[in-house]
Amino acid sequence: MYRRITIAHLSDLHLAADDRTPRSEARLFGRLRGMNGHFERLLADPPLRASDLVVVTGDVTDHGDLAEWERFWSLVEAGGLRDRIAVLPGNHDVCCLGSRRRRPRAEDWARARAGLALGGHEWAFPWVRSVGGALTLFAVDAANAGNSSGLDNAVGRIGRRQLAELGRCLLLFQDAPLKLILIHHSPNIPHPATSRRRGERPAAFWERRALQLDPFDRRCLRLLAAVFRVKAILHGHTHDSLDRTVGGIRIIGAPASTEPDAAGCLRYKLHTLHVDSGRLASRTERVPAAPARPARVH
């Protein structure tokens, strides 16, 4: 059994078929390109390579295309990480952008499952995986609520069937010493007053509606986590680096890992689980998005 387990936690990669293709989400200064190259740089980062597990909490691809999934798995394979990666889909992986329908069609879900299967990965949710003899992962699919408007495909829902099955899995593994739940959508977006008190930017109403699970699902998820003493819930979707405790449950969000921050760095979370004490330490790792230029010699 491992005495310490390290987890590199990435999210919202938004990989494209090639680096010339821009990300679908608009930004103030144009659409982001180069996500694939950024992911390659992240996979070469020494702390990530030394980790026991690499977790990607959704939005692996930008449009859910199989060509994007193939690019993801080829980069993972080239990095020698296929046997220690855990992946789950996000709303972009079950992609139905625009107002053409409210819920994803069966072929969209089938395409996401096929993308996971390309890497020989679990695709039926919830799934359970043991790591290092001490850690148990419980992965949940929340990318199944469809569009709430023509501007949003981001709403998350777990559903009662999956919640019941998650509860059954947690009961079966109730004696596992360390448990983590993986999900794409956030189980909590603070009210504006709470955000201001923390010194954070308050989320607008539409952001809170789109970036977190619906009220029933998020309360059930947090209740299950509390009852079965889950160490933390790891998520993505907000594109922010977050770490907070809600109702006694630690909730940690990874940033959009292939999107450079204001300093030009790519970011991911590095979690360390101390098996003997049960302590979970978490920090944000930063990787320059572009290699440093050699100094000019005069």
Q: Could you say what each language-model-derived stretch is?
A:
Residues M1-R71:
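N-terminal active-site segment of His-dependent metallophosphoesterases
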Residues E77, R198-S277:
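Conserved beta-sheet core of the metallophosphoesterase superfamily
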